[in-house]
Amino acid sequence: MKFFIDTADVGEIKKALALGLCDGVTTNPSLVAKTGRGFEDVLKEIVQLVPGPISAEVTATDYEGMLREGRHYAKFGSQVVIKVPLTVEGLRAVKTLTDEGTKVNVTLCFSPVQALLAAKAGATYISPFVGRLDDISQDGMAMVADIVQIYRNYGFKTQVLVASVRHPVHVLEAAKLGADVATIPYSVIEQLAKHPLTDAGLKKFLADWEKVPKAAK
């Protein structure tokens, strides 16, 4: 399974790259707003850093606007993937952009049927939002399981990119289900490396090491 980092913070991207845990990047307007920077400046910098897929989201909601923004952002680098919302207008844009050779990530997916439509339209990635479904007392990972099964049934090439990841269990369940990608906030990447028994074991090893006679200098 590939790990994308879900951020527009260049500092976080650099840290994830240093760990070897950044196969790609996903951004959205909310993440860009947190940086206080212009989106195009952020995108240009990320393109220089990351060789893998970089999702750049359009803000237009109409077909022509999505095409205009998508074509513009696609010029920033061959690794740029255009992110469009799962709406009727968005699906039209997916079909056109895909036919033009542009990779597309369909975002804000909340049902397996929506994911089926995205795959039929030719999406490169589908982004089911598991955390937001959990927030309304539905089962986000059950949605992912259904999407993975449907795609396998019919041999769709669209990759399942699990999004709205809130904690390590989401990552674990995505991996068990066979999702292609999980896009993960840097804070969750750090949590993945932690376990209380690891900390306790390290503490004990170091304490025991202090008891070992040391050679005289």
From Swiss-Prot:
Keywords: Cytoplasm, Pentose shunt, Schiff base, Transferase
Listed pathway(s): Carbohydrate degradation; pentose phosphate pathway; D-glyceraldehyde 3-phosphate and beta-D-fructose 6-phosphate from D-ribose 5-phosphate and D-xylulose 5-phosphate (non-oxidative stage): step 2/3
Pfam families: TAL_FSA
Subcellular location: Cytoplasm
An annotated GO cellular component: cytoplasm
Enzyme active site: K83 (schiff-base intermediate with substrate)
Entry's EC annotation: 2.2.1.2
Catalytic reactions on record: D-sedoheptulose 7-phosphate + D-glyceraldehyde 3-phosphate = D-erythrose 4-phosphate + beta-D-fructose 6-phosphate
InterPro entries with a match to the protein in the record: Aldolase_TIM (IPR013785), TAL/FSA (IPR001585), Transaldolase_3B (IPR022999), Transaldolase_3B/F6P_aldolase (IPR004731), Transaldolase_AS (IPR018225), TSA/FSA_arc/bac (IPR033919)
Gene3D superfamilies, sorted: Aldolase class I
GO biological process: carbohydrate metabolic process; pentose-phosphate shunt
Task of the protein: Transaldolase is important for the balance of metabolites in the pentose-phosphate pathway.
UniProt similarity note: Belongs to the transaldolase family. Type 3B subfamily.
NCBIfam families, sorted: fsa_talC_mipB (TIGR00875)
Name used for this protein in its record: Probable transaldolase
Organism: Anaeromyxobacter dehalogenans (strain 2CP-C)
